[in-house]
């Protein structure tokens, strides 16, 4: 008992609050158990459960520095703490279980919404990115194949496989028909986007379809080998179709030109400044002006470019000599370059091969109203706006600056028009210049050939003057003996033959000698001189008449 009293006396001042606290904790535990059984929902809301651990921590802190506390009390307090912790942990564990479920649901919803938004954005991008190759684009075979592979949709002018097959059979037709090998080569060369080398089944399917329809007939072989011929249709059906076409064309008005086809030409004409490199100029001139023979004689083009730069008709931006890029100079709206065929070729080459082709909407509006006014100007502007939007969606054009129906646009595909399309009004002038050049060259050739006849005329003209008549007579008398000598040589055999006939008396020989003398050289001289006298008699007569008139006066 002494130990108990001593312990009680020692512990009394500080142990009482601990004991009271332990009792209160037991009461709280009992209350919590009842609440757990009856009202589980309120547990999550109550914040009183979080307070006991703080008091426990404070008590523990107070207990640590006091080594004199009895072992029983310490054991009881430890047991109480252990009993207190599990409900708190269970309640705390239950709280986060409900929260993550709500958080997971919210995260799922947000992720679904973001996915939907991303899908919508991707769809919109796909709609904007979808590109087609326009009919006006000037691309080589390799460029066309690359563009068709890159774009999701094939170019619009490409026909279907059945039409391609009939076209290939007609193109490769021979006496024994068109072979499958020739058809395949033709399609691969002309339509590389089909990739027939890798997808040969397309040709087989098309052959089978056309054979079943009766459009094609197999002349040799079996299956997808051999040769084929296009079956000719009866003559009655095409006549009917022609008549229908004629009627429809007579009734229907002529379709207006689409602005889609007009805009590329407008871009090439309105784009400023116009410049092109020497290689592009040479390529264009050799293609559309074969008469100039630029491939064989490139020095002509180089000299023409250097001459134009010296005159101030062109400006050399880069390079030296005939290399680099050249820019057109203008006086107002008209270019300074022009005149000869070579200069006109350079002008059209720079205007056509200028890249990139850009144009403002104000210039486009002005161009359309001047060249394609239509019935209503407001409606035409509305059509222009719609066509620009359509071209931008298809990927034919790109808006560089501005928004909507303002700013500047740029062509996304190359467009190199021929000189006839680019400057249609200047073609006849060029042809006239060519004709004039040809006429001048022909005149020069004729002048080179004409000088000898002019000398003959110079000899004949002085004979008309009466003062020089004597000199002409002398000249004319000189060649006369030559002619008479030739005639004498011919006339000599006649008198040789005559003597054997003339064996009659001498009386008859005299007249024969006189007769023979007349057709001899003397006779040949007399007609020439007499003719000359007859030609010049009127001249003498005129002179005598003039003298007589003077005498009378």
UniProtKB/Swiss-Prot annotation:
Residues 60-71, 430-450 have a biased composition (Acidic residues). PROSITE patterns: H15 (PS51504). Residues 140-154 have a biased composition (Polar residues). Residues 517-527 have a biased composition (Low complexity). It holds the Pfam family Linker_histone. Residues 157-232, 255-330, 337-413 form the H15 domain. GO terms for biological process: cellular response to hypoxia; heterochromatin organization; nucleosome assembly; regulation of cell population proliferation; regulation of DNA-templated transcription; regulation of nucleus size. Keywords: Acetylation, Chromosome, DNA-binding, Isopeptide bond, Nucleus, Phosphoprotein, Repeat, Ubl conjugation. A central region that included the first H15 (linker histone H1/H5 globular) domain binds at the entry/exit site of the nucleosomal DNA. Component of heterochromatin that maintains heterochromatin integrity during G1/S progression and regulates the duration of G1 phase to critically influence cell proliferative capacity. Mediates chromatin condensation during hypoxia, leading to increased tumor cell viability, radio-resistance, chemo-resistance and self-renewal. This is Heterochromatin protein 1-binding protein 3.
């Amino acid at each position: 008992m002494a130990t108990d009293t001593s312990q009680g006396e020692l512990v009394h001042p500080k142990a009482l609050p601990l004991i009271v606290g332990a009792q209160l904790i037991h009461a709280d535990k009992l209350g919590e158990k009842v609440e757990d059984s009856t009202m589980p929902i309120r547990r999550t809301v109550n914040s009183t459960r979080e307070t006991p651990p703080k008091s426990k921590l404070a008590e523990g802190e107070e207990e640590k520095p006091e080594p004199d506390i009895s072992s029983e009390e310490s054991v009881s307090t430890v047991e109480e703490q252990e009993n207190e912790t599990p409900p708190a942990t269970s309640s705390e564990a239950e709280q986060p279980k409900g929260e993550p479920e709500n958080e997971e649901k919210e995260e799922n919803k947000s992720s679904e919404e973001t996915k939907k938004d991303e899908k919508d954005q991707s769809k919109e991008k796909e709609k904007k990115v979808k590109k087609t190759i326009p009919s006006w684009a000037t691309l080589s075979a390799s460029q066309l194949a690359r563009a068709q592979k890159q774009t999701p949709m094939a170019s619009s002018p490409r026909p279907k496989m059945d039409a391609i097959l009939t076209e290939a059979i007609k193109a490769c037709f021979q006496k024994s028909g068109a072979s499958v090998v020739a058809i395949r080569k033709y399609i691969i060369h002309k339509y590389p986007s089909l990739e027939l080398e890798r997808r040969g089944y397309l040709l087989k399917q098309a052959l089978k379809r056309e054979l079943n329809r009766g459009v094609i007939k197999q002349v040799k072989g079996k299956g997808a080998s051999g040769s084929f011929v296009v079956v000719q249709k009866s003559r009655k059906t095409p006549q009917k179709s022609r008549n229908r076409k004629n009627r429809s064309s007579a009734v229907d008005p002529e379709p207006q030109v689409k602005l889609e086809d007009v805009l590329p030409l407008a871009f090439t004409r309105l784009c400023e400044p116009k410049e092109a490199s020497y290689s592009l100029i040479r390529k264009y001139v050799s293609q559309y002006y074969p008469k100039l023979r630029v491939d064989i004689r490139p020095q002509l083009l180089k000299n023409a470019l250097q001459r134009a730069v010296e005159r101030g008709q062109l400006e050399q931006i880069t390079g030296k000599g005939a290399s680099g890029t050249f820019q057109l100079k203008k006086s107002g709206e008209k270019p300074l370059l022009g005149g000869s065929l070579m200069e006109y070729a350079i002008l059209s080459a720079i205007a056509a091969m200028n890249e990139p082709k850009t144009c403002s909407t104000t210039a486009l509006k002005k161009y359309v109203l001047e060249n394609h006014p239509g019935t209503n100007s407001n409606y035409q502007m509305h059509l222009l706006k719609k066509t620009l939007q359509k071209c931008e969606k298809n990927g034919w054009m790109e808006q560089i600056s501005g928004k909507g129906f303002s700013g500047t646009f740029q062509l996304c595909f190359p467009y190199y028009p021929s000189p006839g399309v680019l400057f249609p009004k200047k073609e006849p002038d060029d042809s006239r210049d060519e004709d004039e050049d040809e006429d001048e060259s022909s005149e020069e050739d004729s002048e080179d050939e004409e000088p000898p006849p002019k000398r003959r005329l110079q000899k004949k003209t002085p004979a008309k003057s009466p003062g020089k008549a004597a000199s002409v007579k002398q000249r004319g008398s000189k060649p006369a003996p030559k002619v008479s000598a030739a005639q004498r040589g011919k006339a000599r055999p006649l008198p040789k033959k005559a003597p054997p006939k003339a064996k009659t008396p001498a009386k008859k020989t005299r007249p024969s000698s006189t007769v023979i003398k007349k057709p001899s050289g003397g006779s040949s001289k007399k007609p020439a001189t007499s003719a000359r006298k007859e030609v010049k008699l009127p001249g003498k007569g005129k002179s005598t008449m003039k003298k007589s008139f003077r005498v009378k006066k």
